[in-house]
């Protein structure tokens, strides 16, 4: 693949595995310099070693910690001098019915803080940098940010992400910043480590990463606002 983006910087949250890691690999192949944010420092540093320390920066960080995110973005700017694109991809799911079963207040709070507050904080902290570069803000939602998924607070957090993406797009009109909501269906990633798979067809993390790069590779005047990506045969 031709390296076309050697001067551009992409910051990815949730970068240590799954969609985030595959997006980092594909972006590196296109020549992006990478600032990679994740809680799992060991996996993050393994990925940086794989992709090359000259062009990739590990930023261990919990996106639910505002100050830690601010510091991570500052370090990325100090290292690379600019940020051209941000992929707010951090998020997870836990079994979360609203009725029946044991109470899980800590899990609920952690999920809302990561999926909603963390994503909003990523936007708030990075958008000033993207205005400078007329850059691109991408955020991971979900197919369940469009439909009602039973027994699932996670679905409610992704409805919130859908609203966040639309609000950011409206705010950034006239700034030159593009905004893209990536909405995967069922994807085979470590996401399913804590919840049962639905037993339907699956996409790979690479399928979603290709979609992210497709949106980023459009001409500056083309703003792909929403990409809903399901595997063929997924029933919902």
Please tell me what each predicted stretch does.
Residues 16-17:
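Conserved glycine-rich cofactor-binding loop
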Residues 30-47:
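Conserved glycine-rich Rossmann-like NAD(P)H-binding loop of the short-chain dehydrogenase/reductase
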Residues 41-42, 60-72, 105:
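The beta1-alpha1 cofactor-binding region of Rossmann-like NAD(H)/NADP(H)-dependent oxidoreductases
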Residues 93-109:
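Conserved mid-core segment of classical short-chain dehydrogenase/reductases
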Residues 123, 157-158:
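Active-site helix of classical SDR
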Residues 142:
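Residue(s) in the substrate-gating loop at a strand-loop-helix junction
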Residues 174-177, 181-182, 197-236:
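C-terminal helical subdomain
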